[in-house]
Amino acid sequence: MNYLIRDATIVNENKIFQSDVLIKDGRIEKIVTHINLKYSIKEIDATGLYLFPGAIDDQVHFREPGLTHKATIYTESKAAVAGGVTSFMEMPNTQPPAFTQQLLEDKYNIAKHTSLANYSFFMGTSNDNYDEVMRCNEKRKDICGIKIFMGSSTGNLLVDNPLALDKIFSNSELLIATHCEDEKIIKENFAKLKAEKGVLEPSDHPVIRNEEACFESSFRAVQYAKKYGSRLHILHISTEKELQLFTNIIPLKEKKITAEVCVHHLHFTSDDYERLGNLIKCNPAIKSPNNKAALWNALLDDRLDVIATDHAPHTWKEKNEPYEKAHAGLPLVQHSLMLMLHYYKEGKITLEKIAEKMSHAVATCFEIEDRGFIREGYYADLVLVDLHKPVTVNKENILYKCGWSPLENFTFPASVTHSFINGNLIYENGVFDESYKGMRLKFSR
């Protein structure tokens, strides 16, 4: 169906302006102050609403295949769409992990039939699947990137063989995304704390997975990338010390090394373990208020390039085990845009910066074709937001399959009212049209 969005306040490419938007055959046909048509069309009255490019989340864990008691591509993509996330890139630590081209394509096939949002999937790496990883080079336009766990996390896909890392960094033609935490430091910290305390608790998590563990691993990844001229993207930066590894003196398009920050590291601090315990246990750990403040500064001055969620759902039971057994990760994809709009209302970030870090910059970093901007000719991945319609997170409106959120009872000052994906109105004021499915993302490489 074609649509005419009337009188929207558009937030795009560092500008805010009033305009109509004509959507035709899945793409943005026209952006003009007032559009007069000689034929009938479905109109959306956007008076008083803000139109954003759909958010693109470059790091989610949707748990399919193999872990579908936690989540599925269908359930989590539905939650994403309700929150204004119109495209996602999913990580390889499913069961089995995406270690072969066939296993990777199996995930694409699931998404083709079930995902309400647009999608791409990272190829997984291990110490011994180099040949399969290199086959991604010929598919560079069809795969978002290669994921390397340089520290162990959920799924234990740790790559710790220097020869394997050397070969991948030297020969991959795709973006390499890394989870950076130093395994040796983590194990030493754990053993020391365990010997001292006996029983560990959630507040010990940032002591075990500390600043030094993050910095040493990120530093090592940067050294590999500089040695071989690799395209490196370090995920979920969580410490002030790591920020020295990144620059803001060149345009994003020219950067070979980029960095992501996640909404939970911008929102929570180590002070919140007392209240939320294992619910905010994640890797890398949520750390001190000083680290949070440094991350905000780096985001706003462009040393940190994109905002993501690292959406990682687990069941309530899995999160409420004793600390050592409790699973790491938290569900966030439904609430990331609204959380950033909360910080807009708090005066922390502008609307233009939100659009940049959650849409424009992600599209630029990954060279995504025809998405991430409100431009004529681009796919109509668009989100309407009511900045004056508060919503409180509760069990009734949480769409994650796991059924909980660390933000439960938090009231956002704004709501997502409409989500268009490929020109289709998939979400409107709590109602979904599931007759349309998302598309596989393509990349201009």
How should each PLM-predicted stretch be described?
Residues 35-51:
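Active-site metal-binding motif and surrounding structural segment of the metallo-beta-lactamase
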Residues 1-38:
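N-terminal metal-binding scaffold of metallo-dependent hydrolase/deaminase domains
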Residues 109-125:
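A glycine-rich helix N-cap at a beta->alpha junction
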Residues 47-114:
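Metal-associated gating/positioning segment near the N- to mid-region
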Residues 200-220, 224-229, 279, 300-307, ...:
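His/Asp/Glu-enriched, well-ordered alpha-helical/loop segment
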Residues 8, 21, 26, 48, ...:
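Divalent metal-coordination and catalytic microenvironments
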Residues 8, 322-325, 376-442:
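C-terminal cap of metal-dependent C-N hydrolases
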Residues 131-307:
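Histidine/acidic residue-rich metal-binding segments in metalloenzymes
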